[in-house]
Amino acid sequence: MLRRLLVLVVAIFATIVSTANATSDDSTNKRELKYVFPFSKIPVTYSRDHIDYPATDVHGCYAHVLAPTSGIIFDVEKKDKWDEKIDAPGTRGGLTITLHGDDRVRYFFSHLGRVKVNAGNRVEPGQWIGVMGSSGNARITKCHTHLGMSRICPQSEYKVLQGEIWPWRFLDAWRKGINKSPVQAKNRVIKTSPQACELAAAQD
């Protein structure tokens, strides 16, 4: 009964957030936000595919991780809680940063070696926020940073948080200095699966 009530509350809040997303997108369109390539100091490479959902793994150990646009740091994890024997999905990212962009897009960086910001911090495009590393299950794979981009949900539902639009298209543009916004791609995903936040919350 309590779980059903929780899901209902999350569903209602998700509807409010979706409306806020649309309203905020309208106001955001009136002022162009700046985007930058979010890795520096070390040359990085990244693929154009991912396991079974849209995301990008970026390789270039110890590269500086930068804020791709302006926004608020919503959440950080500064302790690597991943245990290989348990392999809990919510801990696989190790050290993480979740940025709620002013564009109403959520940017999730995981497997970091160092986190340089705190929840609630305001960041600007190109600000140094972390360092690429091998925390979480990257301890048994390879040093890299996972970048997931998604809509903003009421909470950090892991399934949506890890990614729902392809970052590489935007990384390609930002690397060339092209100010390409992911807002339209995010909005298309919301129209296709409007209940994704609450469905993910029910699975957590």
Q: Could you describe each region identified by the protein language model?
A:
Residues 8-16:
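Bacterial N-terminal signal peptides
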Residues 116-117, 128, 134-143:
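Short glycine/proline-centered loop/turn elements that form peptide/ligand docking sites
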Residues 88-94, 142-156:
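Short, compositionally biased
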Residues 59, 66, 101-127:
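Short histidine-centered loop motifs in beta-beta connectors
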Residues 1-7:
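N-terminal Sec-pathway targeting helices
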Residues 2, 18-96, 125, 134, ...:
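Surface-exposed, glycine-biased beta-strand/turn segments
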Residues 148-178:
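Short peripheral tails and domain-boundary helices/loops at the edges of structured domains
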